[in-house]
């Protein structure tokens, strides 16, 4: 898919245990506003693999890009976002490692949120989240039936991803926005606030679960549109 619009293209990068459909409620709202948008489908097998898959999509786009990352996707846009076409980064309850830092390093800085206790290891190097975790911790503000579907759809995450180091963090040299989920039970809320402050991001706090993009899509879209508008008026 190639975009030739002069309007910035929004590229959506999903998190762990998810795919591009996690943006299903945000995408129609962006399209309604005439914003070109592409949702990446990442393998969640390593930071390098996910960054490469994201770059392939970026290479298909002409003109400025707004990269949006949810959760683990924040590490991906941090790694892939140094491309000159990337003009803005939007982090949604997301990790944002510094140079030489891993997601595991960031997780370890604060007491573990309750959702992390619901991670299951298959013994072969891959992790999933229990159905209970999806219902009570990941998407506790979603209908139970919706959370159960997400549990069924989740792809396994390579456990080694938590040890993958960022090389050059894009947030150091790009305009940034950060959405904090104040009811997050998967990523530490204190960590989210710390990361937003460290990058000097324009910060929005939502009284939402880790899945604000599904429970509060209008509010998430509003922040993305703010980033798009900032580039259009720059």
Language-model region placement:
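Catalytic His-Asp charge-relay segment
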Residues: 173-180, 203
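Flexible "cap/lid" loop of the alpha/beta hydrolase fold
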Residues: 82-131, 158-165
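Conserved acidic catalytic loop of the alpha/beta-hydrolase fold
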Residues: 48-65
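Conserved HGGG/HGGXW glycine-rich cap/lid loop of the alpha/beta-hydrolase fold
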Residues: 5-48, 79
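Gly/Ala-rich beta-loop-alpha elbow adjacent to hydrolase catalytic centers
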Residues: 68-73, 77
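Conserved strand-to-loop "acid loop" that flanks and positions the catalytic carboxylate
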Residues: 89, 177-184
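Conserved loop-alpha-helix segment in the C-terminal half of the alpha/beta-hydrolase fold
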Residues: 182-208, 214, 219, 226-227
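Active-site nucleophile elbow and catalytic-triad environment of alpha/beta-hydrolase enzymes
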Residues: 149-170
């Amino acid at each position: 898919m190639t975009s030739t619009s002069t309007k910035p293209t929004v590229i959506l990068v999903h998190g762990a245990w998810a795919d591009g459909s996690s943006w299903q409620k945000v995408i129609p709202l962006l399209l309604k506003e005439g914003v070109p948008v592409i949702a990446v489908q990442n393998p969640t097998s390593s930071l390098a693999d996910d960054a490469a898959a994201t770059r392939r999509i970026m290479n298909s786009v002409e003109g400025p890009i707004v990269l949006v990352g949810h959760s683990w996707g924040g590490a991906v846009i941090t790694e892939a976002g140094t491309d000159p076409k990337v003009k803005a980064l939007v982090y949604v309850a997301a990790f944002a490692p510094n140079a030489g830092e891993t997601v595991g390093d960031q997780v370890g800085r604060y007491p573990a949120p309750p959702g992390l206790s619901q991670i299951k290891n298959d013994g072969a190097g891959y992790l999933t989240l229990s159905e209970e975790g999806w219902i009570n911790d990941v998407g506790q503000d979603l209908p139970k039936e919706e959370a159960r579907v997400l549990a069924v759809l989740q792809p396994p995450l390579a456990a080694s991803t938590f040890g993958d180091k960022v090389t050059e963090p894009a947030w150091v040299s790009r305009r940034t926005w950060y959405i904090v989920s104040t009811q997050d039970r998967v990523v530490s809320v204190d960590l989210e606030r710390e990361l937003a402050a460290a990058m000097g991001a324009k910060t929005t706090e939502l009284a939402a679960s880790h899945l604000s993009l599904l429970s509060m899509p209008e509010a998430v879209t509003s922040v993305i549109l703010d980033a798009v508008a900032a580039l259009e008026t720059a």
